[in-house]
């Protein structure tokens, strides 16, 4: 990463749809979603860590931590080591920044399965899928380099630009003029909920 790129990554604001998640998230309501992939063989933690670091080099916008400013939350560049650990908690659990080196995603493994839990302020599902696919691809490339030497793709293209999709897709001129039909109302006599017929 060049010095200029690193400077641009020092901080950036949350996009419009991501602003609600830091305010509404808690240990009870995590705002975390999960992606998983099941491999043919048990996962090697060291290789998985290397794969995640390789993927992070391509997806720099995932190398951030969430900070609270005076008026709003923002992302700040995070160069700490990514924590990779064996899965021991339930899926989509609140990501505690203190145990995860402040990253907004958590990579775990269990036997043959690779998981990534992602805090929704960091990204939407599409970017998360692209990032996760890159992790899995990097893992396969490292683990099976000799077997797949001539079969691995080197022409993969990425769009590395962060965008606020809400601003890109929102059109305030479009009004919701659709009229919905009334719901069908059942007729007849109500029976008690616990009645057996």
Which residues are covered by each model-predicted region?
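N-terminal beta-alpha "docking/capping" segments at the starts of catalytic domains
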Residues: 1-42, 187-197
């Amino acid at each position: 990463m060049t010095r200029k790129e690193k400077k641009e990554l020092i901080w950036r604001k949350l996009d419009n749809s991501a602003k609600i998640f830091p305010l509404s998230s808690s240990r009870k309501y995590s705002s975390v979603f999960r992606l998983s992939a099941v491999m043919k063989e048990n996962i090697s933690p060291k290789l998985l860590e290397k794969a995640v670091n390789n993927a992070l080099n391509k997806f720099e916008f995932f190398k951030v931590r969430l900070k609270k400013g005076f008026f709003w939350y923002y992302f700040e560049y995070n160069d700490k080591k990514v924590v990779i650990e064996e899965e021991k908690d339930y899926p989509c659990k609140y990501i505690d920044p203190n145990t995860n080196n402040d990253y907004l995603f958590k990579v775990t493994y269990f036997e043959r399965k690779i998981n990534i839990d992602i805090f929704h302020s960091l990204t939407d599902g599409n970017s998360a899928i692209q990032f996760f696919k890159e992790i899995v691809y990097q893992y396969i490339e490292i683990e099976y380099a000799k077997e797949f030497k001539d079969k691995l793709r080197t022409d993969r293209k990425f769009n590395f630009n962060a965008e606020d999709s809400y601003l890109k897709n929102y059109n305030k001129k479009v009004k919701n003029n659709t009229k919905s039909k009334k719901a069908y109302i059942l007729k007849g006599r109500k029976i008690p909920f616990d009645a057996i017929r």
